[in-house]
């Protein structure tokens, strides 16, 4: 095989691989890691929601985002007190969700033991650390993307392409398309 490949190479029948410049490859690593951390956050949110439901707290039945302001206030109250009454629930809810306080109260009728409160605290601490880690990654990404502001702006002008998508595109294929023969080649390479 190696003899055949060397023969093809000497005959000029092999094309070089497309490899973006170093700073693009480094940016790609960070961007892919960002996606991994987002998956970790989603898994942790699902773990917390499952734990709450198994403990008798069906927050997602009445609160669309249990990690939003109202949901988070309820979770923090449960960590401290293990249960919640109507007065405490009213102080945890924001204006929009207060209209459904009686329905929400029925969905949070469980009680957490000391072990469950400690476990929920651990779960939330891990969730918060993942969110903080994601913010650090995004700060690094913004700094790394600064030299590509013009390209990001150009990509954003395409309908449906957000800044996040623009960054992902640049991270995967770079900005120099000279080594690429056709659009089909870059599509094939990028997947």
Model-derived features: positions:
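A detector of single, family-specific signature residues
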Residues: 1-191
